[in-house]
Amino acid sequence: PYGGKFIGVGDNENSGRPLVFSNRGEVEMIEGLAEAYNAMDVESFTEYFAEEVEFKSYDGKTYNYKKSDLTQAFKPYKSIDWKLLSIVPLKISNTDAASGAMVLSTETRVFKNGKKWKKELMELIYFDLEGKISGMLQFAR
């Protein structure tokens, strides 16, 4: 079933097309990502990412990472608890375009210095045609 509408930035061949649920393994990939992230398993965690990743943080900052940069992701943390609440994978109808998923979650990070970071998150996770994460856009409260 069709629903929603892709508008995009500027006119392009996909502008105005409906969105459909995607079934390219995005749900399983995000569940695996969460498992690796919570275990702070660098090797498994980095396998989910493309060679280059754009991360737009909830605080308005944009970070461009190479996959090799992600090996340092867990360095400041004692523990991480990312709890997935929902995963909605979508793609533009009648295209072979990259897909994305809306992910609602909570996350608690405990730093090695004892400081805690706890947020409710809404993230848009973008997958390239190879099924690797190529971007993330994060909102928090």
Language model regions located:
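A solvent-exposed, acidic/Ser-Thr-rich amphipathic alpha-helical stretch
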Residues: 42-93
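Short beta-strand segments enriched in hydrophobic/aromatic residues
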Residues: 49, 105-109, 123, 140
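A short, structured loop/turn motif at beta-sheet edges
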Residues: 92-99, 112, 126-132
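Short, cysteine-centered beta-strand-loop-beta hairpins and adjacent loop/turn segments enriched
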Residues: 108-118
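A short hydrophobic beta-strand element
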Residues: 97-107
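Short, low-complexity N-terminal intrinsically disordered segments enriched in polar/charged residues
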Residues: 2-39, 47
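Short beta-strand edge/turn micro-motifs at domain boundaries
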Residues: 1-11, 118-141
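Ser/Thr/Gly/Pro-rich, low-complexity flexible regions
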Residues: 37, 51-52, 134-139
